[in-house]
Amino acid sequence: IYIAMNKNNVKITVVGLGYVGLPLTIEFSKHFSVIGFDLNIDRIKELKLGYDKTKELSKEQLLNNSNLTLVSDINEIKESNIYIITVPTPVNRNNIPNLNPLKTASEMVGAILKA
């Protein structure tokens, strides 16, 4: 990854724009072209308007960022060469994680990599 990140053609996609994914997206976008992807269309609309319901980021951080693209269409992340998946893995009362969101996101990214 280090070698790839030193190239000018780096395009990172962060899948899942929650408490982990959104701040990570903003940090990477300080140095690289980044696509923030989330299946929740309303979440993307809110972020594009500068509103973060998690209150992790300010309006300025979201709107004044030329390296950041926010999308909910999986086809818009095809050009990326680095994918980071940051989806929830909630635990049940026995502390067993539900890995279904991670499996689904991995399958989505995998389908793009195969195409």
At which residue positions do the language-model features occur?
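Structural/interface elements that position substrates and couple domains in central-metabolism enzymes
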Residues: 2-115
